[in-house]
């Protein structure tokens, strides 16, 4: 058997060559020399058959030539060039340039006879090749109604080579070996003429075949700009506007008791999950329950041991403080029994079914926990107390979402949960939308909560007694954007709120995703708040909902919010203050009280400030600031503040109703009695701001810092009182200060209406006059977005010869959600907020036009100097805000670029027959389609943002059309914000994605070339094989034919596994690996045997590989969940990820490409379907890709299905081939019965096709 090294098709096109690697040029030269000898021998024999064309040429890509004369190379050159316009069906003798006539006179007759026999064998072999080509053309030129143009195949050899180690298990090919096809065979003359006309029509238009590594200046420049912009974003994110870390370490002595009897009789997940009870060793040494049940739910890939910092603090706080406080025990305070769940570090952020499984398990766990308190052998609880009926739930990260999910599950026990506290939990939307199940689960949960709180009557609200507090870590949390922790779109402010750790008194620091569990300052505040809502005297184990909300606001909010309740107006007088009847202690109306030290008089002294009447035209506000702690009633401290009214006591009237009495009149009969309320319960704790202050918190290893005490009341809140009494209780001189005053709200509050564009261009300046009040407030309504960062600068306050009482203190704050940040010793401040964020649903209560970022400035009013304040947008700092808010964009938006590039490749290929490289197509797209699409999306975003018609909005949010209701999906589109100021984000993200796609393309090229080089080195043939003349003729390991049955069996096995055991994401990963293998093999062949056909196929499979790799991140999270479940021996299949239709097109397409078949060209109207499909996917990826990223897999799956259909039209085992077989059967039956036949040309073509299909 003789192996053909190269040849030409009937139309003159060059076929791919197979030769042993790596001595291709040497073997080619040897074969050409042999064929010259054969041709020379044939010329000396008059009876010899006509000469034939040489059969061994190695084509190389060249520019199309307009000349009709074919170029031929010398034997030393390994290539032959032919004009694409010269189509010679029966080529004559081919002359070799540079080869003169050969001398045959010295040959013997036996040698001449041997040469003649060899020539006859070559003629027979060529005739067989021509017959096979004609048969293949006849079968493939009429493939249904699609009007394909068959492309070049991959492997030019018609002999089946031996298997190679590099051949994939998916490497199959049809029984008929692929050939290099150009024009139709001799079957029909009119088909040949049509091909000639079409070829002449597009000749000169074919693009020049360029290297896949080539890049134009335009593409390079745009890619550098995109990558540079991405580098600026990343650099800004990690270097600018970084909140300082202030958490102190916590310590504990953990112990865990596992409940082994909570088994499969209680829940079907008992073999996967476990329930534990935490015990602080040294304090709680047994496993009996005795207090209030609290359930901790770990987050995504979290551990049950993460409960230990909070549980340890609770055990120590009750043991050291509350247990010794009889009033607290009488009020219902008891120890906390912390239960925790071992989820085997389940991954819930990416998989909705896992989230539902955990919620189902936890409901059964709560049922079991409550039953423990009924078992006297396992409970050490006071029998006089009611049995618990509910559990307090703490959730971290996704554990907080699981906690809310429990209430919508069918196995939820009514009223078993009434208090939920979550930490860094993404309530507003899923962290990623790669799984359809988690997107649906989030929608079901949030819709249920919104629907419950929209009920008019409490009886119709199943969540009426539930309170939800969401605590966010702030800017240091880089795992989940803290914007997603907002619950303003889920619950009204009567049932829950969102607060940031920077707002919590005595915490005042941001925290990362894990530190929020072990931060010492925060866990102390959290534990105290939990103990404050506990009441074991009630079966619910907690106080009523209204009282719980009041407690949470007091512990977690600053106390200066509008919702903060003041206790002074609602309390009865508790202190009786007796003063002399002289007016020396009364401050004149409108004057300010300033004390630079305490105890200077050596005795207790009272300072009275008259309270202005509430009916005055100018609104007044009382403020007091001191660096001393305010005493409660009957406490022996240094300073006490009272709100007093004249007490008209009659002679002999009892004064026993007062808890404390302060007598400053002595034995004087001329005295005034005042009934007073103590203001210590309303005090606001502020961080101390001195010249030595750097941070509002104390860092690890630093001694605790002193704090400022601040009081703030509107006159209406204290209108029932007549005086504010400031009592100096110390008898010895003590350093410190007190400033108290009544100020006009009009002077202390300012609102600046300035557009963001003007703020960006010119900044904003304002001045605090020398006659300013102690506290000034500034509100800027336009500053709401989380995407902007600001710089604030404040000038020095000049106090002259007087000593400065305190350094400037600044508080920035938002009201929805509750976020406050403090800047001590402020000279400048880096301002960033978590306000209106991309993709976050709008709140239940619409925002006021006056809502926005606000600032409070505490400055020393005794310094008679102006203070200038300047504010500007920090452009570089704002770039860093894009990282956390738009990370998921880069899983969807680059698909816009890839699909547009692939669309351009197919359009050029269908027109010219050349499948250009990805980089060349990207260059063409950057000159037209990509800018146009980005411009269209930009105008579309402006149209959606500025549309005031709800009907127009419903066009895009068709899944959430509710008349008269809030559209909670209005921020799901495009870049997720309705602020037209950010219109430029669409082209900026597009620019970055172009750079990312370019880098990713070259990374893939590099990987493919590295693998190709590695395979070439591993397959290097040793010398004893290279010197074997018979082994030299073995072809390269390329694309080998395999039986269709084997291909179908392999596909069927994969589909069966997907439908039963493995998720389709695993099969998709396998497809990507096989496609990578195919690309490596195509690259080897394209580099070893240079031809247009090889380059076309390599560019094609490379682009398909890039498309599949961009979808891979969407499928990997589910695959990770599946592998994790296998690791914990949980073999229950995913019900939501076994749809074979989600992977079958990919398997078929990848199987087809392993055979080396190039996709046929489409010249009919169906070629527009490819363009429309890819363009539609590009638009979807840009508009809906972030919110519904899981849909991108299904859309690309449609592309794979369409390409598989296109491939099947030229495949001899395709469905269309089966239709042809049926047509041939009917044709034969019609001829036999002499009925139903067809006439004319169609009859001849069908008969020829059926005849050739019957030939072996």
From Swiss-Prot:
The keyword Membrane applies. It is found in: Endoplasmic reticulum membrane. Glycans are attached at residues 41, 45, 155, 235, 582, 960, 1212, 1239, 1242. Residues 190-202 have a biased composition (Basic and acidic residues). Residues 37-203 are annotated as: Disordered. It comes from the Eukaryota. It is an enzyme of class 3 (hydrolase). The chain crosses the membrane at residues 214-234, 882-902, 929-949, 980-1000, 1005-1025, 1053-1073, 1103-1123, 1130-1150, 1172-1192. Residues 37-48, 69-83, 143-156 have a biased composition (Polar residues). Involved in inositol deacylation of GPI-anchored proteins which plays important roles in the quality control and ER-associated degradation of GPI-anchored proteins. PANTHER family: GPI INOSITOL-DEACYLASE (PTHR15495:SF7), NEGATIVE REGULATOR OF VESICLE FORMATION-RELATED (PTHR15495). This is GPI inositol-deacylase. It comes from Neurospora crassa (strain ATCC 24698 / 74-OR23-1A / CBS 708.71 / DSM 1257 / FGSC 987). The lineage of its organism: Eukaryota, Fungi, Dikarya, Ascomycota, Pezizomycotina.
